[in-house]
Amino acid sequence: MRILFVGPPLYGLLYPVLSLAQAFRVNGHEVLIASGGQFAQKAAEAGLVVFDAAPGLDSEAGYRHHEAQRKKSNIGTQMGNFSFFSEEMADHLVEFAGHWRPDLIIYPPLGVIGPLIAAKYDIPVVMQTVGFGHTPWHIRGVTRSLTDAYRRHNVGATPRDMAWIDVTPPSMSILENDGEPIIPMQYVPYNGGAVWEPWWERRPDRKRLLVSLGTVKPMVDGLDLIAWVMDSASEVDAEIILHISANARSDLRSLPSNVRLVDWIPMGVFLNGADGFIHHGGAGNTLTALHAGIPQIVFGQGADRPVNARVVAERGCGIIPGDVGLSSNMINAFLNNRSLRKASEEVAAEMAAQPCPGEVAKSLITMVQKG
């Protein structure tokens, strides 16, 4: 069968669908990822065929502009009229899908061009979650930003999804929908690849702590959340790996000797065997840490991050710093908290027992064949 994946051109929306896409390919199906701009190449680097539905798009600049306008408008965490680049992808992708004719479309919650194409060509469509905070209301809100595209392409209404795929751990899932079948799937992190380097080997006599604000938040909000790294990281009894993209370092000052600054690393590799992870609360970071059984400190500010932080804290897998921020004493205590480690390892075991992407791919093919 031909499987079309919608991969919106942002890391947090594209990368989570690539593991399932690879599973379909390994199972012998023809897979195509639809993305845009530089993210078309990012998907191709995963060994997949890609259609660039928005050539030349600078989605990161577009997202920064949207966030700046949202803050000026004082609309809080509401989406506003923002399609997460489905509008920019719509015309090219509708035309392409018309002659490529996929048998199944899979989209993440904000890849709302997927249902439009499904409705136009009467193709089964499935939504794959990428985190905890997805609701039908949320998807409908983003879909409203495609009103003009629905009109341009003579599509009257969104179709009903054949199923939803839930990638969250069973004991933490809060997913609710309008009655579509929910298929559980093990979250298998995809963070890109890299060539092994000697410094990846951790010292056996020292703890390892990862710190990241993800790919979007530093560009939009700066580095205030991790000012403690510059001010007092030397008082933390650990080797600290600080992940900040090269384009988001303008506020960075000198760093203590126990901090290693990196641009891009395969996060799943570094979390295996780490002692803790401090991050902004993005769904990818949250689920990758849960998959590895690593305790977390989650800031949880903006977008879906408060939801991610809350479920981590309620399950006992991490803590939320609150308004007081972080101190070296708090971080040292966190690194030695055995109850956080125990709960995190329990969740990792839950996730390992869930159906893997290959099994889910086979189940979806069966559903399509049965009609």
UniProtKB/Swiss-Prot annotation:
It is found in: Cytoplasm. One of its GO terms (molecular function) is UDP-glycosyltransferase activity. It comes from Escherichia coli O6:H1 (strain CFT073 / ATCC 700928 / UPEC). Its main location: cytoplasm. The gene is iroB. It catalyses: enterobactin + UDP-alpha-D-glucose = monoglucosyl-enterobactin + UDP; monoglucosyl-enterobactin + UDP-alpha-D-glucose = diglucosyl-enterobactin + UDP + H(+); diglucosyl-enterobactin + UDP-alpha-D-glucose = triglucosyl-enterobactin + UDP + H(+). Coiled coil: none annotated. This is Enterobactin C-glucosyltransferase. Catalyzes the successive monoglucosylation, diglucosylation and triglucosylation of enterobactin (Ent). Transfers glucosyl groups from uridine-5'-diphosphoglucose (UDP-Glc) to C5 of one, two or three of the 2,3-dihydroxybenzoyl (DHB) units of Ent to yield monoglucosyl-C-Ent (MGE), diglucosyl-C-Ent (DGE) and triglucosyl-C-Ent (TGE). Glucosylation decreases the membrane affinity of Ent and increases the iron acquisition rate. The keyword Cytoplasm applies. Pathway: Siderophore biosynthesis; enterobactin biosynthesis. One of its GO terms (biological process) is enterobactin biosynthetic process. Its EC number is 2.4.1.369. The keyword S-adenosyl-L-methionine does not apply. It holds the Pfam family EryCIII-like_C. GO terms for cellular component: cytoplasm. It is an enzyme of class 2 (transferase). InterPro entries: EryCIII-like_C, EryCIII-like_N, Glycosyltransferase_28, UDP_glucos_trans. Belongs to the glycosyltransferase 28 family. Keywords: Cytoplasm, Enterobactin biosynthesis, Glycosyltransferase, Transferase.
